[in-house]
Amino acid sequence: MPKKFGRIHLVVMDSVGIGAAPDADKFFNHDVETHEAINDVKSDTIGHISEIRGLDVPNLQKLGWGNIPRESPLKTIPAAQKPAAYVTKLEEISKGKDTMTGHWEIMGLNIQTPFPTYPEGYPEDLLEKIEEFSGRKIIREANKPYSGTAVIEDFGPRQLETGELIIYTSADPVLQIAAHEDVISREELYKICEYVRSITLEGSGIMIGRIIARPYVGEAGNFERTDGRRDYALSPFAETVLEKLYKAGIDTYSVGKISDIFNTVGVKYDMGHNHNDMDGVDRLLKAMTKTEFTEGFSFTNLVDFDAKYGHRRDVEGYGKAIEDFDGRLPEIIDAMNEDDLLMITADHGNDPSYVGTDHTREYIPLVIFSKSFKEPKVLPVGHFADISATIAENFSVKKAQTGESFLDALV
């Protein structure tokens, strides 16, 4: 079967969810002050930002963001009379609301055993191994679920004095190491993270989904995390559609932390880590305009929505970031060929107006655009992996574990 689309570009607006998922009652955030567990039933990332701050997103509105099925319409994003794109929302079937789970399911995997989390912090024997390898002590008081900005506010001054490591976790399956660049160089931090990754793989006794390097700079009271973040993930436990494309000889481009999330498996050309989301758009455009990129798949993650604004519960910053991305959409569309397909989605929610500091269990929006479309419409609500099943069918490779293609619906 001939390809319907020569190139497919998938852009993940990290954490930009569109309302509580049907199973949101099984997922929780914890009140920062009372530590009370509150389920995610009332979470609604786009909806609450639209309601509280307002969103001026003319390009996403024309594509049909306001047409996505919801119990109540978005306050400041009206439905388009004739949307320029197919739109819908997708439900997650995997047992997790973290980055790896979301991206892996989008690429066709069904994660029914959630990655282990460490709400009480990491065990002493692991910390001792890290101390022995690094030659640095670890601040034990930080070894618990912590906001990334709060942990450096609380322990950054001490690290500047002592050179101790700040190791912390969250409600997600991650071990994060924060290091002030004046005390611990990026190179040293990355070596420590690589070591931790090597001793926390499956079968090692303690498995961790991702090890994250978190360098920062500044002075007490004015610390700022830098763009030197690195994620050290596990390899997917089964073949994803990304890997199937690669093995079939189809060009695959990654932008941002996609290569980290999949541990490079299935990535042929890595466009590098983003300094920020606008730099990520620049990198995507650079990939799209490469003369040799005539057919294939690009996969982009824009993480600032999540890392800079969602976890920090910054409604204003989050809204501004969405508007900034909206302002770049015409450039992305201009760079598309007539037979290109653009899909814009998310990987989970992170409602900046919600209790706690962690992700929220939500539907994700899906916008599907091509210059060749005649009369786009609203598609039935589907599942995350429908994206990869559609990509797989287009490029004549087998889908992964789950997902139903909607390729035939795109006319």
Curated annotation (Swiss-Prot):
* GO terms assigned for molecular function: magnesium ion binding; manganese ion binding; phosphopentomutase activity
GO (cellular component) term, any one: cytosol
Q: Which UniProt keywords apply?
A: Cytoplasm, Isomerase, Manganese, Metal-binding
Manner of cofactor binding, per the entry note: Binds 2 manganese ions.
Where it sits in the cell: the answer is: Cytoplasm
UniProt cofactor(s):
Mn(2+)
EC top class, as a word: isomerase
Q: Write down the EC number.
A: 5.4.2.7
So where does Mn(2+) 2 get bound? D306, H311, H359
What Pfam families does UniProt report for this protein, alphabetically?
Metalloenzyme
List, alphabetically, the Gene3D superfamilies matched: Alkaline Phosphatase, subunit A, Phosphopentomutase
Q: In which pathway does it act?
A: Carbohydrate degradation; 2-deoxy-D-ribose 1-phosphate degradation; D-glyceraldehyde 3-phosphate and acetaldehyde from 2-deoxy-alpha-D-ribose 1-phosphate: step 1/2
Which Gene Ontology terms describe the biological processes this protein takes part in? 2-deoxyribose 1-phosphate catabolic process; 5-phosphoribose 1-diphosphate biosynthetic process; metabolic compound salvage; nucleotide metabolic process
Q: Which CDD domains match?
A: PPM
Q: Which domain of life is it from?
A: Bacteria
Q: Which reactions fall under this protein's catalytic activity? A: 2-deoxy-alpha-D-ribose 1-phosphate = 2-deoxy-D-ribose 5-phosphate; alpha-D-ribose 1-phosphate = D-ribose 5-phosphate
Sequence positions that bind Mn(2+) 1 = D14, D347, H348
Q: Which HAMAP family match?
A: Phosphopentomut
NCBIfam families with a match to the protein in the record: deoB, PRK05362.1
Relate the protein's function as given in its record. Answer: Isomerase that catalyzes the conversion of deoxy-ribose 1-phosphate (dRib-1-P) and ribose 1-phosphate (Rib-1-P) to deoxy-ribose 5-phosphate (dRib-5-P) and ribose 5-phosphate (Rib-5-P), respectively.
Q: Which family does it belong to?
A: Belongs to the phosphopentomutase family.
Q: What is the protein name for this chain?
A: Phosphopentomutase
